[in-house]
Amino acid sequence: KEENILFELIQTVDAMTYDQIQQFLTKFLGCSENVPKYIIHNLIRMRAIEATQEDEEGYITCGNSGFQTNANINTDVIYALYYLLDKAKTLDEVLSLVPSNMNNVALSFILNGEYYEATYVSLDEMYKIDMIRKRYENDCLDAEYQKDEVIPFRSVFMFGVKTDEEEREILDKFEKMNLQIPHSIVIFHSKNPITKPNYTEFSIE
């Protein structure tokens, strides 16, 4: 059962890291610490999945996805999945995820009954935030017209940084923007998500 659930999740997101698989299987499926390696090995042996590298410095992808390397993995989704696995409390919340390449969204999901959209942004892509703000405001107008009081979505803006200066620059830009939509700023302290990076989160209601 655990193998099937994991395989379906990898199929949905296209790739996962070893750290993500370990966290998913232990936190949401109740596996002990040594079980994930066995499950990964078994699925690789069955050719259901494959690793981009022999060691744990690679990603796990579906066996039918064609040869992939670390370089052509969509890391936007990888970052968003780290966030979701940390924040989710139930398996259903994890399995609510939907990858997307529409509207600059990497991954959407439902947490505690609220709809989230996670977007990876670099410092030279801050225009994405304004596009999302406009879409949120339009969705609010539609909801008002339909007498629906539900918040359309909560944005998670993800960044990868190497230095404290980069983090300060991001926060300065947000302060100047004075963004008036529900959002979180999630700053990962790494630009290589192959192993789980530390991150800082700033939430604005």
Regions found by a protein language model. Give the residues of each.
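Extended tandem-repeat scaffolds
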Residues: 1-2, 7, 11-12, 21, ...
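Generic detector of well-ordered alpha-helical segments enriched in charged/polar residues
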Residues: 7, 37, 82, 168-172
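Nuclease-adjacent, charged terminal/linker segments that flank catalytic cores
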Residues: 1-69
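Exposed, interaction-prone assembly regions rather than primary DNA-binding/catalytic cores
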Residues: 76-165
